[in-house]
From Swiss-Prot:
Enzyme class: transferase
Cellular component GO terms, alphabetical: cytoplasm
Obligatory cofactor(s): [4Fe-4S] cluster
EC assignment: 2.8.1.8
Cofactor comment text: Binds 2 [4Fe-4S] clusters per subunit. One cluster is coordinated with 3 cysteines and an exchangeable S-adenosyl-L-methionine.
Subcellular location: Cytoplasm
Pathway: Protein modification; protein lipoylation via endogenous pathway; protein N(6)-(lipoyl)lysine from octanoyl-[acyl-carrier-protein]: step 2/2
Binding site for [4Fe-4S] cluster 2: 94, 98, 101
Taxonomic lineage: Bacteria, Pseudomonadati, Pseudomonadota, Gammaproteobacteria, Enterobacterales
Catalysed conversion reaction: [[Fe-S] cluster scaffold protein carrying a second [4Fe-4S](2+) cluster] + N(6)-octanoyl-L-lysyl-[protein] + 2 oxidized [2Fe-2S]-[ferredoxin] + 2 S-adenosyl-L-methionine + 4 H(+) = [[Fe-S] cluster scaffold protein] + N(6)-[(R)-dihydrolipoyl]-L-lysyl-[protein] + 4 Fe(3+) + 2 hydrogen sulfide + 2 5'-deoxyadenosine + 2 L-methionine + 2 reduced [2Fe-2S]-[ferredoxin]
Protein name: Lipoyl synthase
Record family assignment: Belongs to the radical SAM superfamily. Lipoyl synthase family.
Length: 321
């Protein structure tokens, strides 16, 4: 029996070390077992990377993090090249250890009290008009990090009065009422929380999370703020069926959600959950048609779609795929 990993505060645990801490074991994928990527999943990188390096430098200078880098998003080059980024607050170490996600797990450091002001200044310097703020899960905090979200929203608006803010929040497990009460004073323009996948595979995909709890979070926020858009998204290719995806879409509509994102899951490393299927662009188009027929005001459905992918265009109702 191998010796358990001693988790040290502030240390990032990734790949095999992270997966060793998950109660639901994942099997290392051998190279010959990997599904071959279809042509539509191949990305052409931009020739000029100066804008990309500029954004990375701005992040490093102010001690900030982007989910684009921490989660190894396939759209990083495209988004950074267009001068957009999704900021990740509350550090870069997550208290959860989901086997689909490339964000590091461990014992996080105390939140940086100066982060709200540094974030607001960076956004001002970048000249952004629409920004997405997300975070790692912080189960170690009594409010799940809600007050830090509120402080960031307030600081951003003070420095950038004309900006629109979308928050992509964790599930605030065991702290929903407290978290939503805190956010009532400074709500975002768009409230996003991802279901990630269908309930049948939750134990494998999101250990520690609960499908019904996440739906309730979205519904409770909407009930408290009926004029604010709520949004959610799923990754596909983790063993779910198209019929199950459609049923999740119905659940989201029943809980007041009007914006949807569907994108292809990509395995960050061979230690993570393997891709079980690649969903074709035609299938994504069919899912988008289903979503619009259900009453979603906007549905971004495509292989490279992520919840914050061209989020400004999504909020304007412009097609993204």
């Amino acid at each position: 029996m191998s010796k358990p990993i001693q988790i040290e505060r502030g240390v990032k645990y990734r790949d095999a070390d992270k997966m060793a801490l998950i109660p639901v074991r994942t099997v290392v994928t051998e190279r010959q077992e990997l599904l071959r990527k279809p042509e539509w999943m191949k990305i052409k990188l931009p020739a000029d990377s100066s804008r990309i390096q500029g954004i990375k430098a701005a992040m490093r200078k102010n001690g900030l993090h982007s989910v684009c880098e921490e989660a190894s998003c396939p759209n990083l080059a495209e988004c950074f090249n267009h001068g957009t980024a999704t900021f990740m607050i509350l550090g870069a170490i997550c208290t959860r250890r989901c086997p689909f996600c490339d964000v590091a797990h461990g014992r996080p450091l105390t939140p940086d009290a100066n982060e709200p002001e540094k974030l607001a200044q960076t956004i001002h310097d970048m000249g952004l008009r629409y920004v997405v703020i997300t975070s790692v899960d912080r189960d170690d905090l009594r409010d799940g990090g809600a007050q830090h979200f509120a402080d960031c929203i307030s600081a951003i608006r003070r420095k950038n009065p004309h900006i629109r803010i979308e928050t992509l929040v964790p599930d605030f497990r065991g702290r929903m009422d407290r978290a939503l009460e805190i956010l009532t004073a400074t709500p975002p323009d768009v409230f996003n929380h991802n279901l990630e996948n269908v309930p049948r595979v939750y134990r494998q995909v999101r250990p520690g999370a609960n499908y019904e709890w996440s739906l309730k979070l979205l519904e409770n926020f909407k009930n408290a703020h009926p004029d604010i858009t709520t949004k959610s998204g799923l990754m596909v290719g983790l063993g779910e069926t198209n019929a199950e995806i459609v049923e999740v879409m119905r659940d989201l509509r029943r809980h007041g959600v009007t914006m949807l994102t569907l994108g292809q899951y990509l395995q960050p490393s061979r230690h993570h959950l393997p891709v079980q299927r690649y969903v074709s662009p035609d299938e994504f188009d069919e899912m988008k048609a289903e979503a619009m027929a259900m009453g979603f005001t906007h549905a971004a459905c495509g292989p490279f779609v992520r919840s914050s992918y061209h989020a400004d265009l999504q909020a304007k109702g412009i097609e993204v795929k």
